[in-house]
């Protein structure tokens, strides 16, 4: 169990490192751009192909760094971006897609001179298993409140 918590903490640290690196390099954005993202990712009908997700994630990080989005909003919209079936819950596949998306986003970011983050698939599967332990109602999904109130996310 300690190994899984450490793995979870490393995954979260990697995600937050990407967020911090992206936020530090971005310029101030207009509040109306934040409102547009809020509207887009709160909508029921969302187009979620990888290219759009990458662009929107980069914009969210930029807006969070500029103070137009709070860190809680950033977490929430990142959660929503990966809720592909719009059931307000993440299953194991959606969590794995979120981790792979974060990994691919880091690898595509060659202009900042950093070494790409490579997360072995086995570690991502272990991460998903550890997150599913936060499933309070044992329905096989993680809701946003379950994720945010779990012991794992309190380590962020």
From Swiss-Prot:
GO terms of molecular function: calcium ion binding; serine-type peptidase activity
EF-hand domain residues: 70-105, 123-156
An example Gene Ontology CC term for this record: cytoplasm
Name of the protein described by the UniProt record: Longistatin
Class in the EC hierarchy, top level: hydrolase
Tissue: Saliva (at protein level). Salivary gland (at protein level). Not detected in midgut, ovary, trachea, Malpighian tubule system, synganglion and cuticle.
Regulation: induction: Up-regulated after blood feeding. The highest expression is observed at 96 hours after feeding and in fully engorged adult ticks.
Self-association and partners: Interacts with host fibrin. Interacts with human RAGE/AGER.
Functional note: Anticoagulant and fibrinolytic protease that modulates blood feeding of ticks on vertebrate hosts. Degrades host fibrinogen and delays fibrin clot formation. Promotes lysis of fibrin clots in the host by activating host plasminogen in the presence of soluble fibrin. Binds Ca(2+). Hydrolyzes serine protease-specific substrates. Required for the formation of a blood pool, an accumulation of blood and tissue fluid developed at the tick's feeding site. Blocks activation of host AGER/RAGE. Reduces AGER/RAGE-dependent production of reactive oxygen species (ROS) in human endothelial cells.
Compartment(s): Secreted; Cytoplasm
Disrupted gene: phenotype observed: RNAi-mediated knockdown results in impaired blood feeding of ticks on a vertebrate host. Impaired development of a blood pool, an accumulation of blood and tissue fluid formed at the tick's feeding site. Massive infiltration of host inflammatory cells at the bite site. Increased expression of host cytokines, such as IL5, TNF/TNF-alpha, PTGS2/COX2 and CCL12/MCP5. No significant effects on tick activity and health during the incubation period. No significant effects on tick attachment to a host.
A Gene Ontology BP annotation from the UniProt entry: venom-mediated fibrinolysis
Gene for this chain: A01M12
Any further remark recorded for this protein: Immunization of mice against the protein induces protective immune response and results in slower tick feeding and smaller blood meals.
